[in-house]
């Protein structure tokens, strides 16, 4: 099974379109990175079930041709990373964790109503305004929902108090009874917990360990409160754009099940295989803009800085709901 996975990965990363010539030093660097990644995979496997990979030829990571080619050009790049020894199924099973409740009643007043009276800015990046804490790593715990929720809470805390502070995803993993800890959860359940609990601890007071244990919330470590939440109208990227522009970072859900997402490196991500109806991973929309004419969302992931572009991915915007970006979006009220 692992051997088949590696063969599929080689096919994905080897040339799939006309090759673009690169200087020898860059090829050497790519080859060295490939070998180091293979060695790291061997170490992580403990010498067991190591895939049989022929390293006799130098695999070059090329620009990824988009299925359907709707962008009209190759818009993003793939690269080997620390997830190289995992299948896409393993990544989804152990490193996502968005679980949408079967019944999602929407209490009165929780639907976000955008203000259409004025134009939204052409581009927004809340990182530059100091609303976004450093990229975190959820590890092999299905706690993406907690990191997404915490990121949105951190942005609203900055907006309300002027102070940026890392809040505790572990507080949510342990204590949100309507969710399932490392087994998965949903962002609005987390916001509602913080409201009813009258607070959430800081990361310093309640550090992340990525395991399920009993709730150890302490009011002495409380760093933020929440008075409710708002949900963005589904399948409405224009409404999501307004929310990100006027409110701050917004919790969103996407499909993160494809190998192209697993090995994303840079550029604007777009893959027609990304299914808007298969949302399995919670992330944080921290802005939007355009790169070389291609509109995108700025997405903060929780897979550490060694994934993607220092932990971030640019996701195609206004391309028929890329990966379901606007289907499960929400933010807390403070």
Swiss-Prot record:
SMART domains given in the database record: Pept_C1
Chain positions carrying an annotated carbohydrate: 108
EC number(s) given by UniProt: 3.4.22.38
CDD domains: Peptidase_C1A (cd02248)
GO biological process, one term: proteolysis involved in protein catabolic process
The entry's keywords: Disulfide bond, Glycoprotein, Hydrolase, Protease, Signal, Thiol protease, Zymogen
Top-level division of the source organism's lineage: Eukaryota
SUPFAM superfamilies (alphabetical): Cysteine proteinases
Pro-peptide positions on chain: 20-119
Induction note: Up-regulated in response to V-Jun induced cell transformation.
Active-site feature positions: 144, 281, 301
Signal peptide: 1-19
InterPro entries: Papain-like_cys_pep_sf, Pept_asp_AS, Pept_cys_AS, Pept_his_AS, Peptidase_C1A, Peptidase_C1A_C, Peptidase_C1A_papain-like
Catalytic reaction annotation: Broad proteolytic activity. With small-molecule substrates and inhibitors, the major determinant of specificity is P2, which is preferably Leu, Met > Phe, and not Arg
Family: Belongs to the peptidase C1 family.
Function: Closely involved in osteoclastic bone resorption and may participate partially in the disorder of bone remodeling. Displays potent endoprotease activity against fibrinogen at acid pH. May play an important role in extracellular matrix degradation.
Record's protein name: Cathepsin K
Organism name: Gallus gallus (Chicken)
Lineage start: Eukaryota, Metazoa, Chordata, Craniata, Vertebrata
